[in-house]
């Protein structure tokens, strides 16, 4: 597992425990505490991810049954070794990579438009005030996950990113926002909302000016901040 932060890259390896989350064990996993050790090491932690389905089950939210793809609903690893890596991560792949530029999407434009218009009516009726329509893209290519992660880290300037390389799958993610940060008794969040296409003639000051004057972008950002504030209060 490689984790990228503003301070560089952390490589976690030699895992003593691997927990595949299910409906039956997630509560016990979240309540697990190490009360014996007074001084915790930097490897006294779990690294992994939660799937939306398993979190929805945890809080009693019902969602339509999803197609099974045999991918874990959530998985966490406990490392025994931490290696600090250089900020300029370099890697040369030994594999012959085969890239396919064609992507398949699970819904077409007509179906997406129908879903969008339906949700638009629900928002106008006051049933909800935010809906995120998700689509799934598939691509059949032969890539090296670490090589892909290194390339992504150079082109995407997100402050945080990570890569999990397991035996049968790899997960790569990067995000400009941090949902939950907990340090001691302090909990904070760093939400981001708004979209502006990158152009050579747009610098940071011009981008800020655009977001401050744009009504749609300002309202979207305020809505996200309000939602995060509500979540933290719970």
Locate predicted features:
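Extended alpha-helical targeting/anchoring segments
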Residues: 1-234
